[in-house]
Amino acid sequence: MANPGMLCLAISAATLVTACAAARTTTPHSQPDRFVARNVASNIRVGFPLQPCVATMLSRSPTFRETYSTIAGRHDVRVTIELVPNRTKPVRAVTEVRSFAGGQRVAAVRLYTTADVIELIAHEMEHVREQLEGTNLLLLSVARGSDVRRFGTKFETRRGVETGLRVAAEVGGTASRTCQGSLRDASLIAYSF
């Protein structure tokens, strides 16, 4: 059963976006559905059940709004964010960016856990932004004193880590726990047979 204090809004276009917001107050930060309704990006697809979490992030975190808006304003990239629960993966999340002729890019953000999703989404979206800015991770990973680390074919940046932590702090613990709880519930429903 849904939380009695929640109001859900579905917006359909080329993408389905579901945003849930507390219906008790009227501040922009407590009504992510209104923010998302005005700011749905055609080049960013957020898969079920992450839409309410992203809506909350957009309404509460100026840092995430900046990253999201930067990516949304680009015509040369398409981003997909999806939850793919997998306990056998050695990482919690991964972003794969592919480049095509003409400068087009496709970024696939996959979260393999329902833990710390606010932090992970922000962290991975910052990696997309880094790539759009032309960050050369391979070159930086071998530079002395660099904030980029290489692990086999994967890279990690201090900027991504710090952005994830900052957004999680801006969103706040209560909203993060609510998001994680709804994801666990949705995962149980979506993956139970």
Where are these regions (language model features)?
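C-terminal motif of bacterial Sec signal peptides marking the signal peptidase cleavage site
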Residues: T18-A19
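Post-HEXXH active-site segment of zinc metalloproteases
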Residues: A115, E119, Q131-G164
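Short active-site segment of divalent metal-dependent hydrolases/proteases
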Residues: A122, E126-E130
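Long, well-structured alpha-helical subdomains associated
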Residues: E162-F193
